[in-house]
Amino acid sequence: MICKNVQALTAYTPGEQPKDAGIIKLNTNENPYPPSPKVAEALRTFDAARLRLYLDPVFMALRLRIAEIHGCTAEQVFIGNGSDEILALCTRAFVENDGSVGYFVPSYSLYPVLADIRGVTRRPVALGSGFTWRAPADDAASLFFITNPNAPTSLLHDKASVAAFCRTFRGVVL
């Protein structure tokens, strides 16, 4: 019943999770700061009865606002249930059955898992000294993930470097 490539996956092993409730786990993106006063007020005035209703399935109001902020159209804005879902959907949409997924290493550990779930070739590209890279790192991949800033190195790649990579890469860059 379950695809062979999914059966072959290794289960994710989370890092140590301290039991002390007072510890903020930055490694799992917990935030040491309280929400802003605007968020706190929105939560105080939120009608919990609305949770039983579906939202606008295309999130048009949100997409329009994001488009306005970033100078694009709502049709160019994609909304999902977190970045992991969006990355998984892009892997399905942009990578054919005989395609491949490229990514830098070290980087986000989900990228090779997405390739494995999709049943396509992984194309990891080692970062150079100082965790640097140059374009194109690997132009044979169908889809190439660039994490910016990179995790776990935290290095931020400048806009010009990412744009140069996108211009020379023949596949899709996320």
Question: Could you tell me what each predicted segment is?
Answer:
Residues 119-127:
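Short beta-strand->loop structural element characteristic of the AMP-binding/adenylate-forming
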Residues 60-100, 118:
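Phosphate-binding glycine-rich loop
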Residues 114-115, 165:
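Hydrophobic/aromatic ligand-binding patch that stacks against planar heteroaromatic rings
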